[in-house]
Amino acid sequence: MRNHVAVLALALSASSLCGCAKKIDATFEGTITMTTTLAGKAPQPMMMEIKNGRMRFDTLGEGGAPMHGVYDPTRNEVMVFMDSQKAYMTLDFSRATAPAPNTSAETSIAEKAGGKDEVAGISCEKWVSKETSGKRSEVCVIEGVNFFDLTRLRAGAAGLGGVGPQSMQEKKMFPLRSVEYDASGAEISRMEVTAVDKKAVDESRFVTPADYKKLEIPPAPAQP
């Protein structure tokens, strides 16, 4: 079960949001196509659908099994669906027991890199985050859009410091591109939006199928 969440987390490495007319805001409704690439592995496409601030992420799990996740910012929760198993899990990030970010202000620092760039025709602002370990992340973000990144569940994932997943969620800073580097400067992972389509999205895309079984997430082991 943990592997299923990890697979989706990797696919959502730095999920992005952009809009038609070279602009994006909280009212955007439509689909976004992006590609995530992990070092040594083939690029993996992912489709995201947005409606009323909610986000649905469709990707492939282990063995190519279909999976999707739905993030509801009003509840601060993510529902992870294993479609081939007709099962789902609910991750409530408003609870004190929710998984914590992988980095902290004590081990990383984030700052504006200066300047802007354009991703999929959308203007974004450059930020960089550096960790005391030597790792760094470069992101290009837009502001004012809901964000959630499941990489905060992935053990050992490089964080974004002051513009990390939790901080970005709170500040509504959404990355259109994210690139991770290790201490030697080698690229670890990359996510980038490739296409945007502004259109109506059916409400049923965010509804839990009636025949899906809810799975309970086992409690995390006690820390020594």
Regions flagged by a language model, labelled:
Residues 21-224:
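Extended soluble regions of mature proteins
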Residues 16-19:
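C-terminal motif of bacterial Sec signal peptides marking the signal peptidase cleavage site
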Residues 1-7:
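Bacterial N-terminal signal peptides that target proteins for export
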